[in-house]
Structures are given as C-alpha cells and as structure tokens.
C-alpha cells in the first residue's frame, strides 16, 4: 500500500510545518503591536524579551487551564479583550492583571477566589505560583494583553480553534 518513504515524507512535512508556523517571532512584532495598556491611562511597549518570557511563563504556569485564552473551568469567561474589559474591576491592563494574579476575585468582583484560583496569595496550594516574581507577573500580563493582537479570532475563541 504505502511504502516507508511515503510515511517518512509525511512526518517530515508535518514537522516542518509545525516548526515553521508554530507562532510569531517576538522580534518580528513591531512596536505598535507590542504596545499594551499599563493602567487605565498609560501604555507601555513590551520588549521582544518580555514577549518571549511572558509567553513561556504563561504556557508553563497558566496554560493548563487557559490554553489559547479560554478558561477550561468556566468557558463563559475567557481572556479575550472584551471579557477582560467587562470584568469588575476591569482586567484589561498590566497593573490590573498583576493585581488579579496576586489576589483573584470572581468575574463580578464580589468575592475573593484565591482558594480555588492559582495566585501568589495561594502559592502554598498552587506551587507553580510560588516562585513568580513581580517581573514574571508583568510579563505574563503582557502576554495576555498582546495575544488578542496576534491571534485576534483564536485567542479566547474557544475549542473551535484548538
């Protein structure tokens, strides 16, 4: 039926496509794309290194539950720009996301959820949060805010994309 060379070619082709198209190179992003909200009135330009670190830290620390900007435990609340802006308080800037990673609250802001959501405050129960620095949280927040610019329909778009 199919010979060994056929399957080898298929595997090599798949690996090539995966490596070539696996993501956007941080150095290739222009300054405008790397500009995100620092707080409600100021913006900041992430460095290519912050972009890379933020993605790596997000994937290793948050990606289990938030792969692709979704929330596995509550598919109604994602990490897309609209959901972050509509949260109470809004979580659509670096400072507010860092605050959330330190002391998370429910989407409507009515109750603290550090006992069920990983955070710096609950690092004893969620060991992946234990060694994160302020700089790490900043870079993770930057990744969350940058991702909708890079993957506009996929980030937070749900399982139809992943």
UniProtKB/Swiss-Prot annotation:
Identify the cofactor(s): heme c
Primary role: One of the extrinsic, lumenal subunits of photosystem II (PSII). PSII is a light-driven water plastoquinone oxidoreductase, using light energy to abstract electrons from H(2)O, generating a proton gradient subsequently used for ATP formation. The extrinsic proteins stabilize the structure of photosystem II oxygen-evolving complex (OEC), the ion environment of oxygen evolution and protect the OEC against heat-induced inactivation.
| Pfam family of the protein (one) | Cytochrom_C550
Residues given in the record as heme c binding sites: 62, 65-66, 117
Q: What is this protein called?
A: Photosystem II extrinsic protein V
Share what the entry says about its subunit structure, partners included: PSII is composed of 1 copy each of membrane proteins PsbA, PsbB, PsbC, PsbD, PsbE, PsbF, PsbH, PsbI, PsbJ, PsbK, PsbL, PsbM, PsbT, PsbX, PsbY, PsbZ, Psb30/Ycf12, at least 3 peripheral proteins of the oxygen-evolving complex and a large number of cofactors. It forms dimeric complexes.
Does this entry carry the keyword Iron? yes
Task: Return the Gene3D superfamilies for the record.
Answer: Cytochrome c-like domain (1.10.760.10)
Q: How does it sit in the membrane?
A: Peripheral membrane protein
The terms under GO molecular function for this entry are: electron transfer activity; heme binding; iron ion binding
Q: Which branch of life, at top level?
A: Eukaryota
The UniProt keywords, alphabetically, are: Cyanelle, Electron transport, Heme, Iron, Membrane, Metal-binding, Photosynthesis, Photosystem II, Plastid, Signal, Thylakoid, Transport
| Iron in keyword set | yes
Q: List the disulfide bonds.
A: none
Q: How is the cofactor bound?
A: Binds 1 heme c group covalently per subunit.
One of the record's GO cellular component terms? cyanelle thylakoid membrane
Localization per Swiss-Prot or TrEMBL: Plastid, Cyanelle thylakoid membrane
Instruction: Name one process (GO BP) from the record.
Output: photosynthesis, light reaction
Question: Which SUPFAM superfamilies did the record assign?
Answer: Cytochrome c
Task: Indicate the secretion signal residues.
Answer: 1-26
Q: Which family would the database say this protein is a member of?
A: Belongs to the cytochrome c family. PsbV subfamily.
